[in-house]
């Protein structure tokens, strides 16, 4: 069995000491795999990603990246360790060109390495190369999200995490984002995302987790689902908590 790139176990995290939003959540993702976390509003999905990325208060649990314990490291150290994080807004600078946005993502790189990774970004996502001189405001919503992903990839992460990458997008644009993530996973990058559109996201994934009330309620593979009943129960917190 291929070793998992990211293993987070029994994570407790939040925004203030003693007030955890994530109360006991676990997730794993392997190389070239797309894993999605779904659940109701307030379940702790985004907070779990931010805890792994070092952006909120980590209270307890284990986070291993290629076997190395990185739990509790600050965000800038997580980037250096190999975690890329795309927040819900994408944070594309609409006044900057596509090329300038990518340079921002790789600002810590030596000049020669930055040039090499720009070329790789354009190879993986040809339309970015074609529109490298266009500003972010001229891109569609789906294209901006793909640019945000490409920018996070400039540091060559082992795993890329995305917080609701299709939020606010029309179904066609959302499908383009999911298709891009599948191509990305095909290069060996581990993909972990949080999504509100559970049905579409699960279909686009290799595995999924359902969180409710800050805890794991269900996990599985899309092909194992006979219908939506079990997921609905898990959303309501009726599923058996699992690690």
Q: Language-model segments: which ranges?
A:
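Conserved ABC transporter NBD signature motif
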Residues: 61-68, 81, 114-118, 220
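A short, flexible loop at the N-terminus of ABC-type nucleotide-binding domains that lies
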Residues: 1-8, 12-24, 31, 36, ...
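Conserved ABC ATPase signature
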Residues: 135-139
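ABC ATPase C-loop
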Residues: 152-153
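The feature captures the beta-strand-to-loop junction immediately N-terminal to the Walker
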Residues: 38-40
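ABC-type ATPase nucleotide-binding domains, specifically the catalytic core motifs of the NBD
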Residues: 16-17, 98-116, 124-129, 133, ...
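Catalytic Walker B motif of ABC-type/P-loop ATPase nucleotide-binding domains
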Residues: 160-164
């Amino acid at each position: 069995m291929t070793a998992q790139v990211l293993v987070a176990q029994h994570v407790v995290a939040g925004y203030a000491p003693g007030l955890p939003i994530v109360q006991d959540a676990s997730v794993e993702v392997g190389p070239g795999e797309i894993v999605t976390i779904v659940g109701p509003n307030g379940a702790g999905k985004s907070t779990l990603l931010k805890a792994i990325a070092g952006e909120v208060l980590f209270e307890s649990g284990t986070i291993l990246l290629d076997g190395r314990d990185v739990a509790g490291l600050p965000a800038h150290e997580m980037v250096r360790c190999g975690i890329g994080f795309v927040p819900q807004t994408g944070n594309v600078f609409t006044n900057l060109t596509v090329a300038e946005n990518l340079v921002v993502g790789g600002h810590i790189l030596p000049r020669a390495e930055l040039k090499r990774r720009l070329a790789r970004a354009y190879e993986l996502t040809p339309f970015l190369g074609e529109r490298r001189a266009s500003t972010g405001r001229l891109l569609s919503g789906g294209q901006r999200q793909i640019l945000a992903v490409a920018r996070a990839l400039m540091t060559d992460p082992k795993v890329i995490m995305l917080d609701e990458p299709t939020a606010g997008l029309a179904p066609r644009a959302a499908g383009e984002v999911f298709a891009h993530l599948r191509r990305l996973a095909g290069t060996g990058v581990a993909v972990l995302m949080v999504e509100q559109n559970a049905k579409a996201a699960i279909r686009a994934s290799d595995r999924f987790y359902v969180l409710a009330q800050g805890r794991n309620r269900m996990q599985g593979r899309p092909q194992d689902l006979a219908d939506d009943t079990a997921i609905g129960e898990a959303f309501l917190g009726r599923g058996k908590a699992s690690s």
